[in-house]
Each structure stands twice: as C-alpha cells, then as structure tokens.
C-alpha cells in the first residue's frame, strides 16, 4: 500500500537546450510555491527533485506526471525567435519498506 501523504517529484530537461533548463527551473519554483500555498512540507533532494509531505499529496500531484511543453519567445535567442522546450515530470509515491526474501514468486 502506498502512502498518499508523501510524493517525490523529479523534473528533467528535455529538448530545448538552455530554454529547457530554464523551463525546469520555472516548474520547480511553481511546485515549491504550490506546496507553500497548501501548507505542505517540502525538502529538496537534489537540483531537480523534491520530496513533498502533506495531506493527499500524491493523489493531487500524480496527474502531473508526463511531458510538459513550453512555447515562448526565447530570452536566450538574439533573434528573439519562438522556441519550444520540453520537460519530463515524474511523480512517485512513497512505498513501504519490504523484505525481498519474503516476496512470493509465482
């Protein structure tokens, strides 16, 4: 059984170079502000991963998993052209500790 009150969110830059990295940073800030708004506890595990604890966190965030796209005029392009950037968001629940020696193998 999963713990619905704990989730780990990892965000990875996809295609888009500097714009994709900037998109990941924007998403991380957005999720951090969302956790503050909901009075959840958040802990940064590394540069692109957050552990969030609060009531029904996993239930509310699980649908955020997947590829997210941003289309904008790039601040990194001298020609001010429109660029598309992608990021991958992975939302995982906290799983209980288990002893692999006791797992039934069919």
Give residue spans per PLM region.
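A conserved glycine-rich
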Residues: 1-106
């Amino acid at each position: 059984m999963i713990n619905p009150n704990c989730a780990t969110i990892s965000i990875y830059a996809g295609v888009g170079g500097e714009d994709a990295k900037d998109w990941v940073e924007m998403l991380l800030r957005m999720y951090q502000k969302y956790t503050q708004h909901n009075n959840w506890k958040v802990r940064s595990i590394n540069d692109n991963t957050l552990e969030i604890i609060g009531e029904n966190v996993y239930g509310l965030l699980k649908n955020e998993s997947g590829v997210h796209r941003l289309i904008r005029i790039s601040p990194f392009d001298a020609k001010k052209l429109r660029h598309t950037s992608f990021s991958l968001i992975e939302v995982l629940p906290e799983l209980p500790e288990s002893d692999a020696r006791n797992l039934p193998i069919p």
